[in-house]
Structure formats: C-alpha cells, structure tokens
Amino acid sequence: PNASFSTIVDNEEIMMTMNTIASQKKLEAAVWLDLNNGMNRTGIIPDKEAALLYQKIALSSNLKAKGLHVYDGHIHASDFAVRKEICDRDFDLVLGLKKQIEQLGIQIKTIVAGGTPTFPIHVKRDQVEVCPGTPLLWDQGYADAYKDLKFIPAAVLIGAVVSKPAKNLMCLNLGHKAVAAEMPPPRLKILNFEKLEQISHSEEHIVVACVDSKNYIIG
C-alpha cells in the first residue's frame, strides 16, 4: 500500500495517449521525461523541444510531472577521472535543460540519473536520485573494469564437468541458461582455475581449454 508507481516518456503522442487513458480511469499518472544525453537508446535530446514537452506534461490534466530521467550507460571508461569528466560533461546537457524548463516557470525538483559505472558520481549531486544501471547483482566484468567500485562476490554459480571431448578440452554445464551471452568471452570467472581458457559458449555448455583434462574428473 505504500508503493508508488511512475513511468517515463520521451514522445508527445505517447504522452497524450497516457493522459487520455489516465483521464478515462480517473487517475493521475506520475511521469518522468526520459532524456538521451549520449546513450542513444531511449529518450529525447535535451533541447528546446524537450523543454516544451515537459511543459505539456506539467500542464496536462491527468499527468504529474515528476522530473527528469537520464540513463548514461554509454559511459564506461575504466579510469575514474576520465569517467567523471565524461559524465560531468554529458550531465551539463541535463542541467541546461533543467534551466530551460525552470525559465518556463516550472520547477524541477528531482532528476533521476545514473548507470552502473557513473552512479558514484551522481550520488554526490544535489537534487539527484541515483539509479544504477544494474540495481542488484553485477557480473565479474564490472569488478574487473571498475576497481574503484570495490565490488565483492555476492553469488557463485556451481557447474560440473560433463565431458572431456579431447585431450586438452573440458565441457562444463554453464551455458547461456546460466550465464548471459550478451558480452564477449570470457563471460565468467572460474574460481581457482582462472587460467582455463573459455573456447566456446552455447545454450547449455561452455567449453574450456586446459593443460591436461585428465586431472579433472567428470561430474
């Protein structure tokens, strides 16, 4: 009962449809304006058009303008100083839009911003709620790339050797069903056996190269 729901929008036509539906349901829908400050996946460019769209949200009958939302997942420099420089530069576009909107007489109380590598930067800003790109569990790639975030292991996958198809090869049952395939190999860290080279990855299996597979027991 204490939960509140909101959504994002970056298009005037969709915004108007949302307002119509909310009116029909006799509801007030909470809406954030989604911005594109470099990610180029969703969001509206933070310019005059975006300011006018936010104004229309604020003036609509059944929508409540909550603020600005920006996901900057395109910023992934490993070096913190470089990452912060890019993050600050791209966030200046958001602050510029905030100023434009406030010049229209509309106050922006909150900006929701962040991505996994940038949330430590945004958390120090005033009037910004942090929204990490990955909110709960990160994969080993983040720990390797962002030493400053000091991730610690929170979960471990258990796999077994299911076959030894050749002298220097082993097949484990840690395929796509267990480990996401979106990133290039290596996709997982094999604890205590980091030198095992990951050769191929399919739906149910991962094949690794080893010095001598006879040292490993199937099962």
What are these regions (language model features)?
Residues 1-80:
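Active-site-proximal beta-alpha core segment in soluble small-molecule metabolic enzymes
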Residues 82-219:
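Active-site anion/phosphate-binding pocket segments in diverse small-molecule metabolic enzymes
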